[in-house]
Amino acid sequence: IPKRSGAKVKSIITYNFDDLIEESLSKVKLEYKTIYRDEEQHDSDELPIYHVHGFIPGRESFDREASLVFSEEAYHKVYSEPYHWSNLVQLATLRENNCLMIGLSLSDPNLRRLLEIAAQKQSKNCRHYAFIQRLSNDSLIDDSSCVKINEASVNKILQTHHIIQEKMMESLGTRVIWFEDYSEIPVLLDEIRK
């Protein structure tokens, strides 16, 4: 990740509560600002890291006032408030930038809703990309099962599933980048960066 002036990465939005991203950025001495509530602001030389479901930092800087979206009820409250800061940040980012989504199943209804809204209003230059792990017949066929499934049938079903997934994501302005093993992600990121 380049330094902030001329940075290609404008922000990071995470749905995780932990501070693992911050720990990694500290190791490479990149300035960042953790944002997990409405009143937080960042300087132009800081990479904003938005924790849209809340934040639990390491013990040394634990904030007892931080709100977390743990329960389904709390999630629905955020989801139903269109002007909640986390929805506004996500929507603005999705509308104005090319986004790369890693580690998401993209089954979250609020994220899909925001992607759909952004796809309707975004410029034609904005595209989003999502790394999604390709399902394999190995993950679906259990050799110890007494029920035998035809491998060719499973492959056909998976192929159809992947095509449907791609079309569905395309309607949300997002192109799927398939991977089979997590070790492929750094290589794919290097290819994208070039």
Specify the residue positions occupied by each region the protein language model found.
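Substrate-recognition element of Asp-dependent hydrolases with the DxDx(T/V) motif
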Residues: I13
